[in-house]
Design a protein with these regions (language model features):
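Short catalytic/metal-binding and nucleic-acid-binding patches
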Residues: 1-225
């Protein structure tokens, strides 16, 4: 049984509030429609319910891609991970739980957001719960919320000390996604090539704040490196 997760979290206020409000309103409307369809039909497999669920999943995909574009363009908000000391501290906190809370497969620390892929080292019962849960509900699973709270809470405190500031460091919400069967390689490449995509480096191996698990490096090595 495998429940490898692709998680993206970002700095507070790094997406325009108008964009966030629009997404929240549309998402809430679709969720309400889903509840109504389930209540009316008493069947979560009805054609109407299935159609609405597909629309919700499509909305979430579109929102992820839009956020990724806004983050790469650094449209608004802070870019604290441009400071090497801050980026190092974030990377250090991702490594800290490797082998204890999860098996860390990859990450990329960008100027205002982080992509990471890991497999939680949890009970088979919790793994089953993760696999059953819709992506948007993953953050509410106690075992996962504890992991993310540990990563984000400690790194926020340490980074704020470096920056001599107080206040929110990370946005509360994150993008959480269970990697589907056969999509693992694609997800790893997506994460590692984030800095390549926006022209920071030519090969992912050259980016200081990229990480790939040792056993996977040869599999994903850049052709030109």
């Amino acid at each position: 049984m495998d429940a490898t997760l692709f998680i993206t979290f970002r700095l507070a206020d790094s997406i325009p509030k108008s964009e966030v409000r629009f997404y929240i309103a549309k998402h809430a409307w679709l969720k309400d429609q889903l509840k109504q369809a389930e209540r009316i039909t008493a069947n979560a497999q009805s054609a109407e319910y299935t159609c609405l669920l597909a629309k919700l999943e499509q909305l979430n995909r579109e929102w992820f891609l839009k956020c990724e574009d806004l983050l790469h363009r650094e449209a608004v908000g802070p870019t604290w991970m441009r400071d090497p000391r801050v980026a190092d501290k974030v990377a250090e906190n991702l490594h800290r739980l490797d082998g204890d809370a999860y098996r860390l497969d990859a990450f990329s620390v960008m100027s205002n957001h982080v992509h990471t892929i890991f497999r939680p080292l949890v009970s088979s019962e919790l793994l089953e719960e993760i696999l059953r849960c819709p992506d948007e509900g993953l953050a509410q699973i106690p075992g996962l919320s504890k992991i993310m709270h540990s990563i984000k809470g400690r790194s926020a405190r340490e980074c704020n000390l470096i920056l001599c500031r107080i206040g929110s460091f990370w946005e509360h919400e994150s993008f959480d996604h269970v990697i589907r069967k056969g999509k693992f390689d694609k997800a790893i490449r997506y994460v590692l090539n984030n800095p390549v995509k926006i022209g920071l480096v030519r090969n992912w191996e050259d980016y200081r704040w990229n990480y790939c698990r040792k056993e996977l490096i040869e599999r994903f090595r850049s052709p030109t490196s």
